[in-house]
C-alpha cells in the first residue's frame, strides 16, 4: 500500500503522511450491518456523568459496523464483495456475501482481494481468511482473531498488522506466541483465522497536526508537572523536576508496577511479556 507525503501548503499539512488504498470501497457501508449506536459519544463519562476515562471526547460521528468475530457460519462459502474503511478500528474490514444470501463483515486479512472465496469450518483449506479450530491448524502457522473461550468470538490479534504464531500443542491446549512476547495456552477447540490482519502500514502514517487527533475523538494529555498541586502529585514547585517516583493522578506508581489482577487465568500464561 503506497504512503504519500503531502505537500507543505500549510503548517498543518507539512508533516502529514497518508496511506492510499485504491481497493477500498468509496460508498456507504452496508446498512443492515450498522448498529444504531453512535460510537464514542460518551466523552469518557459514566452514567453519573463523571470522567472514568480521560482524554476522550469530541470527534466525528461514526456508526458502529457489526463485525463477525465468531466466524461460525460453517459449510457455506462466501466471496469478498468489497474492502472498506472502518473508523472504529485500525484494520480494514471485508464484506462477505454467502451463497445463501447473507452478508457479514469480517476483519480484512493480509493478501486477500475482492473476489476471493472464504469459508469456515473444521476441514476448510489452510489459506488466509479461512477460520477453523486451532486443533486443525498446523504448528508454526500465523493466525489472528483468536478465541479465548470456545464460541465466544475472537479476542486476540484484531488490530492492524497483528498476528499470533502457533508454536506447539500440549494435550487439549495450543501454545501460542503473541506479538508482545507472551506465551500462553488456549484450548484446541477455540477458533482462529489463518493469516495476519491487513493494513500493517497503519503505524507509518503521521497525522501532522493536533486537530487530526481531535477528529478521532482524542483529547490532549496534560503533563502532571504542568498542573497545580491540587490536580496532580507532580504539580507545583518552581522547577521542572518533581523530585519523586512518577505516579498517576491518584498516586499509583506508573513505572514498573504490576497492574494485572486476573489471577484466575495466570496458569494459562507460560511466559509473561516482560521476561
Swiss-Prot record:
Q: Which top-rank group of organisms is this from?
A: Bacteria
One biological process term in Gene Ontology? cytoplasmic translation
One Gene Ontology cellular component annotation held by this UniProt entry: cytosol
Q: Where is the composition biased (Basic residues)?
A: 255-275
Sorted alphabetically, the keyword list is:
Ribonucleoprotein, Ribosomal protein, RNA-binding, rRNA-binding
State the InterPro entries in the record: NA-bd_OB-fold, Rib_uL2_dom2, Ribosomal_uL2, Ribosomal_uL2_bac/org-type, Ribosomal_uL2_C, Ribosomal_uL2_CS, Ribosomal_uL2_dom3, Ribosomal_uL2_RNA-bd_dom
* UniProt-listed PANTHER family: LARGE RIBOSOMAL SUBUNIT PROTEIN UL2M, RIBOSOMAL PROTEIN L2
How is the quaternary structure described? Part of the 50S ribosomal subunit. Forms a bridge to the 30S subunit in the 70S ribosome.
> Into which family does the record put it?
Belongs to the universal ribosomal protein uL2 family.
Task of the protein: One of the primary rRNA binding proteins. Required for association of the 30S and 50S subunits to form the 70S ribosome, for tRNA binding and peptide bond formation. It has been suggested to have peptidyltransferase activity; this is somewhat controversial. Makes several contacts with the 16S rRNA in the 70S ribosome.
Instruction: Please give the name of this protein.
Output: Large ribosomal subunit protein uL2
Its organism's taxonomic lineage begins at:
Bacteria, Pseudomonadati, Pseudomonadota, Gammaproteobacteria, Enterobacterales
